[in-house]
Amino acid sequence: MNITRYISKAVLASSAFCSIAAVSIGTLTSCDDFLDVKSETVAKENELFETKEGFQDALTGCYELMSSQNAYGKNMSFYMVDALANYWDMNLPMGGSENADISEITLFDYESDDSRQLIENTYLQMYKTILQANIILKNLQTNGHVIGNSQLRNMIEAECYAIRAYCHFDILRVFGQVPQNATKTVSLAYNESTSIDEMPPFYKYDEFVAKLKADLDKAEKIMKEYDPVYNHTFYETFPNTTNSVSLSEEYLYYRRMRLNYWAVRATQARLALYTGDNATAHSLAVEIINAKSDNGESIVQLSDLKPSLDNGKTVIYPSLPSENIFSLSVFNLLTYTNTYFPLEKIQRSSLVISDAQYNKLYEGQVTASHNRYSYWWRRCTTNQSAVGRVLTKYYWNTNSDTGLAPNAYNNLFIPMIRLSEIYLMAIETTTDLAEANSLYNTYMRYHNVLLDADAFASLNDVKNVIIDEYRRELIGEGQMFYVYKRLCSPSILWHSTNVSEADYVVKLPLTK
């Protein structure tokens, strides 16, 4: 399989009928118009699922929907959700940021026209993705026999359950109530239907979480039997490498780029931690860290973020592809990350942190060797010579900043789950001080920081350090807001006022 062709594939016919179903209804003027669109949608659907390739294209379409700018390609990663975490300095660009939507989001203003539009676009895209996964699941029941390979058929089913759960979980983390001691309750739609003319049922928090667990359990059970990466390393599931395994279907390669067994386990760990089940979160995190292939190699390893030789070129991959448990390919990533993270002059569209923020972020760290400090940031100026720091996580080579690196996979993606986060989860949830110190020692060693002594004298020390580590590690990935929210933290670094419970509950859009 050609990796460049694979990750740059346009949204296919499946996405087209899903788009008609999910968003065009609002523009219809009569019942006849609606029925015409519905008939066209059904026709496209029936045609698509007549072949194995149609199912594959539909699933690829799900990931395309997830990787769009209205979902994880921007809003659910470095833009809207990281603005909720108050990472970006909205005042540093000359004249102030032109990103009015997230300027308001940073203040937890969910009522302005700009922020409401951003929220609505994101909400719709997430449910559009879920709807497409449901359509695939429905057609697997009625027409799955056209997929002769049972491993492929089962993996398509499992990935759809995983996609549905993954998207619903982040809807919960953005729009749902705080998970502990909530005084403001919120019911959310958990959509298991393919209907485009009926509102899905809404569920209370505990019911919604039960739905999430059920879908993740279904995905895990199937993937444990059929996913190649269950007993092979991620590297082995890339074709044409020295250790590539032989798989029955080309579509089963590149497991890191789609929801897989270990990504499901990691999502289960995230859910357990979010809902306060620290023991389960710890058990799952340690399981992932210790996971071995049939030949005894680690399924996934931490990245040391060092320059490496790739097809004859010395390159740096700041997004740490080798430790990604799940990532989304975004073939046009640099066409818009250049807008938000410019490597020369800071513009009004730029997402930046100030020098003061930068120093606070790495306060107390061994910055002389810390590889995130060295490779994730670039010092830039505005037209008025104000200084800020630009995140370089989504650039392929911070040494040259020019030309594509040889391996397209290593630079055209958004990290969704990384092993570094799993380490931090294990450190946060352990009740064994020695284990906390051992895990943290390993974690910091891969940051090129060698500790002379144990970092923690008590488990209380862990609590004091871990939030800073999450904040440093997860910037640009849309995860830090969820850390603050599950703790219902009364303060967020760089937010000037106390944060209330209501601030953590993004207002549901009015759209249907």
Residue locations for each model-derived region?
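Membrane-proximal, proline-rich intrinsically disordered regions
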Residues: 30-86, 330, 478, 492-512
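Short, surface-exposed recognition loops and adjoining beta-strand edges that mediate ligand/DNA contacts
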Residues: 46, 76-92, 177-184, 188-189, ...
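Conserved, well-structured interaction surfaces
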Residues: 56, 99-175, 198-206, 222-223, ...
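Inward-facing hydrophobic residues that define packing positions of alpha-helical scaffold repeats
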Residues: 59, 130-133, 209, 216, ...
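Elongated scaffold/linker segments in the mid-to-C-terminal portions of large proteins
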Residues: 117, 207, 225, 259, ...
